[in-house]
Swiss-Prot record:
GO CC terms: cytosol
UniProt keyword Cytoplasm, yes or no: yes
Family statement: Belongs to the GATS family.
Coiled coil: none
Residues in ACT domain copies: 72-139, 262-322
Pfam hit, one: Castor1_N
UniProt subunit comment: May form homodimers and heterodimers.
PANTHER family (UniProt xref): CHROMOSOME 1, WHOLE GENOME SHOTGUN SEQUENCE (PTHR31131), CYTOSOLIC ARGININE SENSOR FOR MTORC1 SUBUNIT 2 (PTHR31131:SF2)
GO biological process: negative regulation of TORC1 signaling
Protein name: Cytosolic arginine sensor for mTORC1 subunit 2
Highest taxon listed in the record's lineage: Eukaryota
Organism: Xenopus tropicalis (Western clawed frog)
InterPro entries: ACT-like_dom_sf (IPR045865), CASTOR1_ACT-like (IPR049479), CASTOR1_N (IPR040778), CASTOR_ACT_dom (IPR027795), CASTOR_fam (IPR026249), CASTOR_mTORC1 (IPR051719)
């Protein structure tokens, strides 16, 4: 398998719900007028708490400098795993489950923090730029590591470091954060960029105007429906994660869906905001899912993490993760 280090240098930022109108001009330009920018990597995710933005340095320049934009203090690089041969059958586990053992767990073992963004097309593993030498050393045995430079994929320079590098002891990784599962059903879909103009007004309404601040806080004690919507435009490909109620607002012939029309349930991870320094959160969730062969998408946001699993698996997933949680006591 190949691990590709993409050339985007990324910023991760958060905007409070009540301040989104300060940024809509730049965000609309990034989402719907990308040909007018040099941005190649843009993702916007709305949660009950905030909007999380992942954007490359060129796109970041489209956003106004503001005290209302909270920016994580590192530059991040996006990695993704490419299976050789292109012969992967549709029955193989998709999403974060596929890379749990080969990527997520080894990085957690070396205390390297990751930030995940699953899309309709692929899974991006974000690591801090300063951690890249450690990432490469950790994964070099498992992967052919390639780097994208000026659009060309070339063998990565050997930045691997061995100094201070110890082979980790295998440790159990119990789930340590509270979990909740909202009642919404979600779909992970896409649309042809050429059809984007026909739904731009609808998307703008979904992203910025419907379900305003008044609906945005749902107590985690009674997990009913929550507000969650994710839009990504990365290297020309669009990915959308939305609940079924939102999906029904779109013309049915525009959205791509899997042949099975699969619906997904969410597991939200975190009671208090998780921050960026703790390692192993993605591994705590993805390893039990991989062991049970359950596919999953995983979306990290500025404050909390979100795993999406097939709706028919949700009870088994919750049970498996609660068993893992119990092991910490």
């Amino acid at each position: 398998m190949e691990l590709h280090i993409l050339e985007h240098r990324l910023k991760v930022a958060s905007i409070a719900k009540e301040n989104i109108q300060l940024f809509t001009y730049g965000l609309i330009k990034l989402a719907f007028l990308s040909s007018k920018t040099r941005c190649k990597f843009f993702s916007l995710t709305e949660t009950p708490e905030d909007y999380t933005i992942i954007v490359d340095e060129e796109g970041f320049l489209e956003l106004p400098s503001s005290e209302h934009l909270s920016v994580a203090d590192a530059t991040w690089l996006a990695l993704n795993v490419v299976s050789g041969g292109g012969s992967s059958s549709s029955s193989q586990p998709i999403g974060v489950t596929k890379i749990a053992k080969s990527v997520i767990a080894p990085l957690a073992d070396q205390n390297i923090s990751v930030f995940m963004l699953s899309t309709y097309q692929t899974d991006f593993i974000l690591v801090r730029e300063r951690d890249l030498p450690f990432v490469m050393h950790t994964l070099a045995a498992e992967f052919t590591i390639l780097q994208v430079v000026n659009g060309e994929t070339v063998a990565a320079d050997n930045l691997g470091v061995t100094n201070g590098f110890v082979k980790p002891k295998l440790v159990q990784r119990p789930v340590i954060h509270p979990l909740s599962s909202p009642s919404n059903m979600f779909c992970v879909t896409s649309l042809d960029p050429y059809t984007l103009p026909t739904v731009t007004t609808l998307l703008m309404d979904v992203m910025f105007y419907s379900n305003g601040v008044k609906d945005s806080v749902v107590g985690s004690e009674e997990p009913g429906h929550i507000r969650f919507f994710s839009f990504s435009l990365i290297e020309g490909y669009i990915s959308l994660v939305m609940d079924v109620q939102t999906q029904q607002r779109f013309p049915s012939n525009l959205l791509f869906t899997s042949a099975s029309g699969e619906l997904w349930k969410m597991v939200r991870i975190g009671g208090q905001p998780l921050g960026f320094d703790e390692c192993g959160i993605v591994a705590q969730i993805s390893e039990p899912l991989a062991a049970a062969d359950i596919p999953a998408y995983y979306i990290s946001t500025f404050k909390f993490d979100h795993a999406l699993v097939p709706e028919e698996n949700i009870n088994g997933v919750i049970n498996a993760l609660q068993v893992s949680q119990a092991e910490k006591h």
